[in-house]
Amino acid sequence: LIHLSFVLKPTRNREKTEKVNLQGTLNALSAAEASKAKQFIYFSSTTIYGAYPDNPIWLNENSLIRPKSRFQYAVDKAKSEFLIEKFASNNRSLKILILRGCPVMGPNANNFISRAFQKPLLIGLRNYDPPMQFIHEDDVVNLMEFAMLNEISGTYNIAGEGTITWSEMAKLIRAKMISLPAFLLSLLTEISWQTRIQSESNSSGLDFIKYRWTASTQKLKETLNYQFIHSSHSAWQTFCDKKT
């Protein structure tokens, strides 16, 4: 059983969204138990590590889980992992696989990053240009198939090889970008969120284009001997090719 259902975009009704996300995870686990499924696959997120100035260059699966408290998507992903681990302790026969993925990119991408680059003017943070990771949508599908056929279990970070910076992304997609001071952009983002001018994110989302939050995929390579077809750069390029 593969659990992918999740509220991706932030909402202003945090309690309701949390209930949908966490109850959805519990329902999926119950379905796996009732159907006597052999394997449960959960698509988590590298955002659960949080974007912080003291992050190491590469975050591994044993790094601290510290999602930004106001970035609900990451908070609920981390809470869902906890529910799954608790369930696993009482259901030893079920193979549980947790995939902590970076943003999925490709021709059909629809996430907070892809939407930012579809706007007439791209906003950047002055003096900040962190490396980003992406995984191509085809690589996600291929990995799921590999995991099911081989009944893989455990927790793995997944991301395309290498990184690409925010400014490099803007050049590839030929976006007009303006860089604002961090304090000003944070203020404008928070005001526009509170006044409902925009519904993408409160100011906590800006940390993900301010600080590094790159995840190591060494465990995936060494334990499973698995390699993705697309790098982070080429995954982004396929999105650009579709949009330009």
Residue ranges and their predicted role:
Residues K219-E222, I229-T244:
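Amphipathic terminal alpha-helices
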Residues F87-Q133, E137:
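NAD(P)-dependent short-chain dehydrogenase/reductase
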Residues L26-Q72:
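Conserved Rossmann-fold NAD(P)-dependent oxidoreductase catalytic core, especially the SDR/UDP-sugar
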Residues K16-N27, S35, V75-D76, I135:
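Glycine-rich NAD(P)-binding loop of the Rossmann-fold in SDR/ketoreductase-type enzymes
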